[in-house]
Amino acid sequence: MLDVNFFDELRIGLATADDIRQWSHGEVKKPETINYRTLKPEKDGLFCEKIFGPTRDWECYCGKYKRVRFKGIICERCGVEVTRAKVRRERMGHIELAAPVTHIWYFKGVPSRLGYLLDLAPKDLEKVIYFAAYMITKVDTDARHRDLPTLEARIGVEKQQLEDKKNADVEVRQKRLEADLAQLEAEGAKGDARRKVRESAEREMRQLRDRVQRKIDDLDRVFDRFKNMKVQDLEPDELLYRELRDRFGAYFDGGMGAEALQRRLADFDLAAEAESLRETIRSGKGQKKARALKRLKVVSAFLNTRNSPMGMVLDCVPVIPPDLRPMVQLDGGRFATSDLNDLYRRVINRNNRLKRLLDLGAPEIIVNNEKRMLQEAVDALFDNGRRGRPVTGPGNRPLKSLSDMLKGKQGRFRQNLLGKRVDYSGRSVIVVGPQLKLHQCGLPKQMALELFKPFVMKRLVDLNHAQNIKSAKRMVERARPVVWDVLEEVITEHPVLLNRAPTLHRLGIQAFEPQLVEGKAIQIHPLVCTAFNADFDGDQMAVHLPLSAEAQAEARILMLSSNNILSPASGRPLAMPSLDMVTGVFHLSRLAEGALGEGRSFSSVAEAQMAFDAREVALQAKIRVRLRDTTPPSDWVPPADWVTGDVFTLETTFGRCLLNEALPEGYPFINAQLNKKAQAAIVNDLAERYPKIQVAATLDALKSAGFYWATRSGVTVAIEDVVAPPNKAEILDDYEQRADRVQKQFDRGFLSDEERRSELVQIWTEATNKIAEAMEENFPETNPVYVLVNSGAAGNMMQIRQLAGMRGLVSNPKGEIIPRPIKANFREGLTVLEYFISTHGARKGLADTALRTADSGYLTRRLVDVSQDVIVREEDCGTERGILTRIARKGADGVLVRDRYAETSAYARTLASDAIDANGEVIVPAGTDAGDVAISQIIEAGIEQVRVRSALTCESRMGVCAQCYGRSLATGKLVDVGEAVGIVAAQSIGEPGTQLTMRTFHSGGVAGDDITQGLPRVVELFEARSPKGKAPITEVSGRVKIEETEKTFKVVVVPDDGSDEIAYPVSRRSRLRVREGDHIEVGSQIVDGAVDPHEVLRILGPRQVQLHLVDQVQEVYRSQGVSIHDKHIEIIIRQMLKRVNVLESGDTTLLPGELCERARFEAENRRVVETGGQPASARPVLMGITKASLATESWLSAASFQETTRVLTDAAINARSDSLVGLKENVIIGKLIPAGTGISRYRNIRVEPTEEARAAMYSVGAYEDGGVEYGAFGTGSGQAVPLDEFDYRSSGDFR
């Protein structure tokens, strides 16, 4: 087997017949599979043991050799090698074909590679391959030229002979006619009889002349065809071809089928063809030049690689190992087999029949038909259904060919190589575990015992509870009491991974320390539910066990839930108190007027606690408490003589004192009622300023307090708590009358239907809002429903409005708003009509959700694919460039306030240049991480814009550098080298995809003028599609003139430089952004709507199109209230603009019109310029994510994404080499991924001993001059040296 760690590249190429024979362990000659009586493989058949290896370990076919001691012997009786049965997974066979066949991928793919190489149309190629036309493969032009006069003379002689013969025959007939007529006259026959005889004779003579003329014409045609015959001419007329072959067979060769192509390819001069194509490209224009370019790509692919074009025609077919196309016996004694066996059997049957026909010397027509059938059988084996009707099995199901084995979700790539099943894992239903700490999970005992079985068994043997592993295993299976104690010991501090499908982002898998629990359900900490998107209505989760010490260390350090509090998408905490916890804290921090014990003073919190326990003071009563060792609230005004650290008295409640005990020491006292937003702000602040351990502890304390006081608060919802506003009827009456007035105006013809609708919609929207206000005012503050909404625990006012106010307006299936509202609420109940019209919205919601989930998943998959090789490869690329971002804007009072988008643009980035205030003083130097503190300093200094480093301007050749990426949002520190930031970016954009809406909004119910929004808009942007009804942008700067016609506006721009005016026709329905006489700059948008990104790239250049795309994507996410950092979107856009289109190739090896990566283009140009050559020129290209994924340098990654056969065909012809830099390629071949601790700078760390360590080793005599040899993980002999005495030097940061 290949050892994946011993190669750095993987090349794919075209296999020649010799390669196939070299791989093979023998020829498969018979179509038989297994003997149905003995169930043993047939000799020379598709499962033959002699070819593929034994079916049982160390046992030959006939049974002469059994047992491992005969290893490697080949049995002289049956010829089977004695070895392991697993060789049947890797040994191949082959079928020697009686006639060559073409490989369907190269003939039938789009574009047809064979067609491009030979310059034949695919239709003509098909005629040759499937025996419908002859092809001339060779013409001896010199001999033809030499002998042409002789041949022409010979043909002339033949024609003359025919003429002479014709004349003689006609003369003979003429004489016979005269004799006949004389005889008739002598007999005195009538004129009628004489005329008949004459006509008959003339007819015969005419036929004679025609027959000879046809022969002469045929001779001319044959000779003309021969004179003008060229290599690769097709001749569909079989008779003509035979005539040519009989007469001039010495001067040319021709044939049908793959044989003809094979002969043609053998004589094909690649170098000469390439030269003539380059000449055509230099001198040609238009269509001709374009075709020559495409052909040159294929020709130069064969020229530049070791591939031979002969590889596209096969003399033998490989047979894949039998264990990859198994045959298994079912219960009923029948057999189930892989479709491939059927396809192979068809090939073998037809091949054997063809061999027999050739041996018998059968007529050409029969042989050709058999060859055609063999070609079709091989086509079906390689790619069934690519040409003609697919071969079907029982029940008309198309058989799965070799190509189908690779393609799609069930194919080899995605099913078996990128997604494998995992040992040491289990799954179960989840339930909540409120008693757990943030880093813990509850693991059912049975499950833990099964998962940790090997560990428990080893420990039992170590502790002498069992003699050997076998008895230990028996003890575990019988669950002896001692086993549970050992299990408890084994799982201590051994983290497990929990995963909930769908794993939309990296927080879908986190590590926890297991706690054994009774029952069969896994227990989950309530605060990690947000990250997993889990609830307890029957969700299941999978458990995985990290085995090695390194895996455990990584799980504990990188994946432990208490280390993953921040969201990788926005850098803000995800582990927020929610639902009951919010209610509890809200209740705890509430201040109730007139409660028991109001106005009392206490000397300390402890005294207040005693009073509370004695029921003398209520939890929410306003009291005065003297606080010591406490930081006062930020809004507290201290007395004149107060200094920090003094005791102070505060008017607060006992509940708030309890709440503050949950917060870290030294945190400012919180003296306010905390709803969800305020609680989130506190957690946010903690995450920004405190170590993770403390944040986790505080979150746990808040969780416990929340649950405890939510229970004590007694918040429950009864139907009586849903209180409708008492004046609802009056409000409705008022608006009802207004609606009637509008209806009357419409009936009288004062309003159009459109106006009536919009007026009614406006009236009822107003009514709904009025009722919502009345309802809100009507709720008492302690009403449980109101408390739930007010605290932010659950629901919002819109939902409460539907319960207690009125449902309001709904839309119909067309997407228009129905102008009659639903006046009832759910508390009163709806009428039948109201219920009916509201069903549409409800159903659409569910249908939309289902569609969105699939679309969003597909978007995530494409994003991951395009960005999977973006890894932080170096500390700093050293670029000076950056992008300008707005960090502050002027508020209403003219004071600078933080820009609302600074959170997703400037936050967590590295400054590219110093932030300098008006006096020229450096406030924050370049290279600083822009956290909340730095941003506040910059704003206080009156600076509005800063230049920050960005992935868009990073100059790393591969991936990005740590400085340009900035802070890792998930950890809050500068990103580590080796972090797979591309995958994180893709997950951050894809994960909220399900929340985005699907619908296309109608502007005010007008059909047509739709704006694409939500998920489809994000897809449109990332796929770089031209939007429907795109808004034009100006190509020059100048003044605007607007001309109106009946149907359109014409916006004319008069350029400043006096060149020709440019007119932009615009639909009358669009909203103009410019007015007559305005002066506009290049790239200004003329009307509202979506702009074509390709236009932006063409007119304004790459930087502007990057910023435009970031901005547009953010617009969609912001409209749904989703916070994603710009840097994630930038990484995807960097990948979309990675390539350039070569315009002129200069002296480089690049081809004009070729797409190539910018890095390769620049390197090639540098090479040429250094040798004094002419560099190439190119223009940047914006590629959609699907195209960019398929255009990647890695053929493994592209093939596992989409269009597998096309990618592999292309890669094989170009002998593409995959340098295994991305993640997917390495997962596919089973190597460690080059990210995180798998990156070479962490893998190749050598631990050098210090001087003290060397000295300590003298005593053991293990020291040899020339250094110390260490095996893996320092397994040198000698005494153990304390770890902290080792000096790791600068060989890499050892985390």
Curated annotation (Swiss-Prot):
Molecular function as annotated in GO: DNA binding; DNA-directed RNA polymerase activity; magnesium ion binding; zinc ion binding
UniProt binding sites for Zn(2+) 1: C60, C62, C75, C78
Disulfide bond residue pairs: none
Enzyme class: transferase
Pfam family name, one: RNA_pol_Rpb1_3
SUPFAM superfamilies: beta and beta-prime subunits of DNA dependent RNA-polymerase (SSF64484)
Co-factor note (free text): Binds 1 Mg(2+) ion per subunit. Binds 2 Zn(2+) ions per subunit.
Keyword Heme applies: no
Reactions catalysed, as given in the entry: RNA(n) + a ribonucleoside 5'-triphosphate = RNA(n+1) + diphosphate
Positions bound to Zn(2+) 2: C877, C954, C961, C964
InterPro entries per UniProt: DNA-dir_RpoC_beta_prime (IPR045867), DNA-dir_RpoC_beta_prime_bact (IPR012754), RNA_pol_asu (IPR000722), RNA_pol_N (IPR006592), RNA_pol_Rpb1_1 (IPR007080), RNA_pol_Rpb1_3 (IPR007066), RNA_pol_Rpb1_3_sf (IPR042102), RNA_pol_Rpb1_4 (IPR007083)
Record keywords, A-Z: DNA-directed RNA polymerase, Magnesium, Metal-binding, Nucleotidyltransferase, Transcription, Transferase, Zinc
EC annotation from Swiss-Prot or TrEMBL: 2.7.7.6
Cofactor: Mg(2+); Zn(2+)
Xref: PANTHER family: DNA-DIRECTED RNA POLYMERASE, DNA-DIRECTED RNA POLYMERASE SUBUNIT BETA
Function: DNA-dependent RNA polymerase catalyzes the transcription of DNA into RNA using the four ribonucleoside triphosphates as substrates.
Family the UniProt entry places it in: Belongs to the RNA polymerase beta' chain family.
Subunit structure of this chain's protein: The RNAP catalytic core consists of 2 alpha, 1 beta, 1 beta' and 1 omega subunit. When a sigma factor is associated with the core the holoenzyme is formed, which can initiate transcription.
Name of this protein: DNA-directed RNA polymerase subunit beta'
Gene: rpoC
